[in-house]
């Protein structure tokens, strides 16, 4: 179950109907009980977001360097090639043509405003939420310290 405390759901896939009812398998496959469809992840997007994201630490990246930056950081955070590819395919068109991007990977601001209730609890859970602001000029910012993700037993990437 997903509980948004500072926004409303706008798009979900598969359809979110009072929660997702899926079975997770050790290879990461999710089977949706509503229609039997198989998924690698559950997608949601929000509107009317009132969360105040933390931009006190992060990275100022030239738009032309966004792809290599994301590959490096996402790999460090434990994503597989396929997971990185899907993340980059979604975000790169929005970011690479900006002069610069101020990029942060949110933790508490994200997990506190988008709470998950997963039953049974997975052995490991990776939640990556990137926030960015397009910039015309580079800015100095304290680099953000990122954490890696170790996959153990039944794991989920959200």
Give the positions of each predicted feature.
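Protease-labile, long low-complexity intrinsically disordered regions enriched in Pro/Ser/Thr
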Residues: 1-158
């Amino acid at each position: 179950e997903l509980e948004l405390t500072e926004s409303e759901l706008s798009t979900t896939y598969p359809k979110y109907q009072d929660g997702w009812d899926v079975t997770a398998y050790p290879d990461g496959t999710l089977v949706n009980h509503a229609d039997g469809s198989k998924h690698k992840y559950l997608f949601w997007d929000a509107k009317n977001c009132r969360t105040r994201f933390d931009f006190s630490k992060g990275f100022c990246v030239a738009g032309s360097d966004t792809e290599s930056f994301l590959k490096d950081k996402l790999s460090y955070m434990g994503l597989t090639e396929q997971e990185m590819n899907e993340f980059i395919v979604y975000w790169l068109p929005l970011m690479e043509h900006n002069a610069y991007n101020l990029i942060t990977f949110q933790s508490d601001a994200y997990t506190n405003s988008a709470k998950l209730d997963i039953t049974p609890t997975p052995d490991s859970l990776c939640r990556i939420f990137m926030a960015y602001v397009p910039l015309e000029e580079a800015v100095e910012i304290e680099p953000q310290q990122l954490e890696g993700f170790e996959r153990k037993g039944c794991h989920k990437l959200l």
